[in-house]
């Protein structure tokens, strides 16, 4: 399928909207009223530092809502204001934040149900309004909704769209796309639908496995088994790993994406030589600015003298998970929570999600005496949620101090 031609056709439809309905000023005002925090603004103005009694809170210097998320959330809310009585659907979570998605449900925005990863669009009717989330949607989903006569409101982050253009460029020039991402993540599913021949690698370890195969060190049957659900239909490693371009899920760890890019460049250089490199490898630049800023700020934060760190964001949020990885790699006692309610003020507990594990309750969360706490949040977390977490910490520190006295 010519995905570029389809996008051009869709974008010219009078039932397609990617600009929203309200002025930027009105949109910003509505979002500020819903999610911004005076406390967080004052902490920013104070060098990202709050001192209260025995508690010292240090915020990362870049955290929370990014521009793409703000745009998506604002467009979703204004869609309901523009269509006050129509049936409105969304193909997935607008962003990976439970409070924001619950707010949409309270506005009677319905979420497309899915069974074993297969979405059920049978209840969506002609004339219904359908919102595409910040992660985007697959070509198949967009085509289905367009042909059904739905009004499509596209909140896809422009950085995600940039990755789509990259893999389409690979396809046009007959390069296979190596996509650094999580194979079942909504964004990677959307990106791969715009690609031609593709392979999804989760991390540097998987990328190294592919590199070894290119250099003649792998087994074909093992390769096909390993990537059976992470490659385009009919992918042939002996045919399709000769010309490669690299792209990424925008929320992956920046340093790892860059390392994977360098690995494949060196691999193709070793196999084909410098004179032929450009015929076998396409350089890339699909790293999201906001992801990069938040990860860089996290690397700075973990260099502070911290007793513990709280990372706030949806448990299915890729960018939040990578922030937690940075903290743990530094050896800091760090907790990933999705809502302020995970902190038990009376019991001094925190219910958190360790990497790759189920929820766990930690007792004696806040230690005695003076304490330095670092805080950051993923790109889908509003400032007001961060404020509520800080208030919980303040209350807990005061309660524990009163108990000690």
UniProtKB/Swiss-Prot annotation:
Keyword Iron carried by entry: yes
- Which sites bind (2E)-4-hydroxy-3-methylbut-2-enyl diphosphate? 96, 185, 250, 317-319, 380
Amino-acid positions noted as binding isopentenyl diphosphate in the UniProt annotation, renumbered to this chain: 96, 185, 317-319, 380
Q: Name one Pfam family in it.
A: LYTB
Which GO terms are recorded in the biological process aspect for this UniProt protein?
Answer: dimethylallyl diphosphate biosynthetic process; isopentenyl diphosphate biosynthetic process, methylerythritol 4-phosphate pathway; terpenoid biosynthetic process
Q: Which molecular-function annotation in GO is an example for this chain?
A: 4-hydroxy-3-methylbut-2-enyl diphosphate reductase activity
Q: Is the Nuclease keyword given for this protein?
A: no
Pathway in which this enzyme or protein is active: Isoprenoid biosynthesis; dimethylallyl diphosphate biosynthesis; dimethylallyl diphosphate from (2E)-4-hydroxy-3-methylbutenyl diphosphate: step 1/1; Isoprenoid biosynthesis; isopentenyl diphosphate biosynthesis via DXP pathway; isopentenyl diphosphate from 1-deoxy-D-xylulose 5-phosphate: step 6/6
Arranged from A to Z, the UniProt key words for this protein are: 4Fe-4S, Iron, Iron-sulfur, Isoprene biosynthesis, Metal-binding, Oxidoreductase
Q: Which reaction does it catalyse?
A: isopentenyl diphosphate + 2 oxidized [2Fe-2S]-[ferredoxin] + H2O = (2E)-4-hydroxy-3-methylbut-2-enyl diphosphate + 2 reduced [2Fe-2S]-[ferredoxin] + 2 H(+); dimethylallyl diphosphate + 2 oxidized [2Fe-2S]-[ferredoxin] + H2O = (2E)-4-hydroxy-3-methylbut-2-enyl diphosphate + 2 reduced [2Fe-2S]-[ferredoxin] + 2 H(+)
On cofactor binding, the record's note says:
Binds 1 [4Fe-4S] cluster per subunit.
- Known EC number(s)? 1.17.7.4
Instruction: List the cofactors.
Output: [4Fe-4S] cluster
Q: Please, which domain of life does this record's source organism belong to? A: Bacteria
Q: Which annotated residues bind dimethylallyl diphosphate?
A: 96, 185, 317-319, 380
- Coiled-coil annotation reads none
Active-site residues?
187
Q: Which residues bind [4Fe-4S] cluster?
A: 66, 157, 288
InterPro entries (UniProt xref): LytB/IspH
Report disulfide bridges, numbered on this chain.
none
The text of the family note is: Belongs to the IspH family.
Q: Which PANTHER family match?
A: 4-HYDROXY-3-METHYLBUT-2-ENYL DIPHOSPHATE REDUCTASE, CHLOROPLASTIC (PTHR31619:SF5)
What is the annotated role of this protein in its UniProt record?
Catalyzes the conversion of 1-hydroxy-2-methyl-2-(E)-butenyl 4-diphosphate (HMBPP) into a mixture of isopentenyl diphosphate (IPP) and dimethylallyl diphosphate (DMAPP). Acts in the terminal step of the DOXP/MEP pathway for isoprenoid precursor biosynthesis.
Q: What is this protein called?
A: 4-hydroxy-3-methylbut-2-enyl diphosphate reductase
């Amino acid at each position: 399928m010519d995905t570029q031609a389809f996008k051009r056709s869709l974008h010219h439809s009078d039932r397609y909207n990617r600009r929203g309905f309200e002025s930027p000023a009105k949109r910003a005002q509505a979002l500020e009223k819903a999610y911004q925090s005076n406390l967080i603004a004052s902490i920013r103005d104070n060098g990202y530092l709050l001192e209260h009694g025995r508690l010292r809170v240090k915020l990362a210097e870049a955290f929370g809502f990014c521009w793409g998320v703000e745009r998506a959330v604002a467009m979703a809310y204004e869609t309901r204001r523009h269509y006050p009585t129509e049936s409105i659907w969304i193909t997935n979570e607008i962003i990976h934040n439970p409070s924001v998605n619950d707010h949409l449900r309270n506005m009677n925005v319905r979420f497309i149900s899915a069974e074993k990863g297969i979405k059920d669009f049978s209840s969506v009717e002609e004339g219904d309004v359908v919102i595409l989330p910040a992660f985007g949607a697959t070509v198949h989903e967009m085509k289905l909704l367009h042909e059904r006569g739905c009004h499509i409101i596209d909140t896809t982050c422009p950085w995600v769209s940039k990755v789509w253009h990259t893999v389409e460029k690979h396809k046009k020039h007959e390069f296979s796309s190596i996509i650094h991402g999580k194979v079942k993540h909504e964004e990677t599913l959307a990106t791969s639908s715009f690609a031609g021949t593709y392979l999804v690698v989760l991390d540097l370890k998987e990328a190294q496995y592919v590199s070894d195969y290119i250099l003649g060190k792998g087994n074909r049957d093992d390769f096909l088994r390993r990537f059976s659900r992470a490659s385009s239909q009919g992918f042939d490693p002996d045919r399709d790993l000769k010309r490669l371009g690299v792209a990424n899920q925008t929320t992956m760890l920046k340093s790892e994406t860059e390392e994977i890019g360098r690995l494949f460049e060196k691999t193709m250089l070793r196999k084909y030589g410098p004179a032929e490199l450009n015929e076998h490898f396409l350089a890339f630049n699909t790293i999201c600015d906001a992801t990069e800023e938040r990860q860089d700020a996290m690397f700075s934060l973990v260099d502070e003298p911290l007793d513990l760190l709280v990372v706030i964001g949806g448990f299915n949020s890729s960018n939040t998970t990578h922030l937690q990885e940075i903290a743990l790699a530094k050896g800091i006692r760090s907790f990933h929570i999705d809502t302020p309610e995970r902190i038990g003020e009376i019991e001094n507990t925190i219910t958190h999600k360790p990497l790759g594990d189920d929820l766990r309750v930690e007792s004696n969360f806040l230690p005695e005496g003076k304490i330095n706490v670092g805080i950051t949040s993923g790109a889908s977390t509003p400032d007001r949620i961060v404020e509520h977490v800080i208030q919980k910490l303040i209350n807990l520190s005061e309660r524990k101090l009163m108990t000690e006295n």
